[in-house]
């Protein structure tokens, strides 16, 4: 196991402290996590997204507004005494910033990005599909959220897809894009693209991002409307995507950067990175 070989991720220690699905990142593993989070945020900000650092707990209204509740209540951690939920994605608190809002047409587009830990009960504790970094109860993710005029939302979706493509290209990872068919779509989404990177060790593709257009589904629940200035108010369209989710990206970077001298990984940003080139490598 490469994470043990390089002493960068400790699953046994996480199991001791909390339980299965809560790894401890150590040494250069922790540095890699931090560097990637900053790298993703900087890439998003360079495209006009404004950074948000939201709460990690949300109330029931917030979970309902974005569609996690009641549908996915069994997959969310619930603090019963306070009736609050640990977020499964930054999409929930960030989109809820504009709950019960009337936006002027000149306020659009709204482009937000944020890093948060994410918490999901859905992960199992055994089996090949949940081993290592494949499925975790707690993981790090950087999200992008858009609130848009309905006439522009599909153009914006294409822009978001291209943006995620550019990040994966900078990381020089083998990836593919899937347009989900109707039967695979979540009930909140009108159109979703999944991004998958190839795992050499597992010899299969692993999802690292989903980019979705929810059209007016979320805005109808959230009551987010646009004032067009002629006494016309219509529901906005909301979109979001992962840019990016870290665990499987970390696994793919480790697997795809093995050399005879060790592992070449992205450990720190540089002036070249700030000009839009890939992050530099250093040997472990």
PLM segments and residue spans:
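Conserved oxyanion/phosphate-binding beta-strand-loop segments in alpha/beta enzyme cores
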Residues: 1-18
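Structured aminoacyl-transfer and RNA-binding surfaces used for tRNA recognition/handling
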Residues: 22-247, 251-265
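Intrinsic disorder/low-complexity detector
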Residues: 196, 273-275
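Conserved small/polar residues in nucleotide/adenosyl-binding loops
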Residues: 266-273
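Hydrophobic alpha-helical segments, chiefly the membrane-spanning helices
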Residues: 277-284
